[in-house]
Amino acid sequence: VVRIMILPNVKDVVSIILTMKMMILCCVITVKSAGIMGLSQLDFEDLRGYAIMIKVLFICHGNICRSPMAEFVMKKLVSDANFADHFQIASAATSTEEIWNGIGNPVYPPAKAELARHGISCEGKRARQVTKADYAEYDYLIGMDSANIRNMLRIFGGDPDGKVARLLSYVGSERDISDPWYTGEFGTTYNDVLEGCTAFLRYLQQNGRIDT
């Protein structure tokens, strides 16, 4: 009689345990699925943000005059247009002439002063040399003159993705931006840089890279 009473209880206990295991398993699967869906949603939002990030590298010979002027003029233009969150903008040199013991020189004082006259700060900027890895990192690699372009192509080993351009090509000009280190015409260089950067921003808008 005792055995007859115990056996049904054991079966009931086993049945309850199995049922609980199934319920727990279902809960785990549901939670994991929800987690995966949530993660996918987050990843999608992140990827969408990265998709509209436009990476621009301005390049000149020494990275102390023209390319830093272009970098900070472009930063101001995109900030004024409320596009700053969509851009990563920097500048570099094709040479190491302004880099000593691994430390780059700051922006050349007359170039810095010209930017300051237009309310633009370049504080903290130091020269650095462009590398082959920059080709993969940036969407647009923009030189100031034809010599810059030749040196860029040498460093990158070509331009298979069509990322390299001269700044004034965006205004439809074949003209180079002269190096004010030699000309002393920092105001002229600023105007050329501003014209080129403005046209470049317009190009991005017209080609659907950023919303207008």
Regions found by a protein language model. Give the residues of each.
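Short, Lys/Arg-enriched N-terminal segments with co-localized hydrophobic residues
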Residues: 41-52
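The −1 position to Zn-ligating cysteines in a subset of zinc-ribbon hairpins
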Residues: 9, 27-33, 55
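Cys/His-coordinated zinc-binding microdomains
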Residues: 14-17, 32-35
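A broadly conserved sequence feature marking short terminus-proximal activation segments
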Residues: 1-6
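Short polar/charged helix/loop
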Residues: 50-212
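Local cysteine-cluster metal-coordination motifs and their immediate loop/turn environment
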Residues: 12-14, 66
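Short linker/helix segments within small regulatory modules
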Residues: 20-28
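Short metal-binding segments enriched for Cys and/or His
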Residues: 36-40
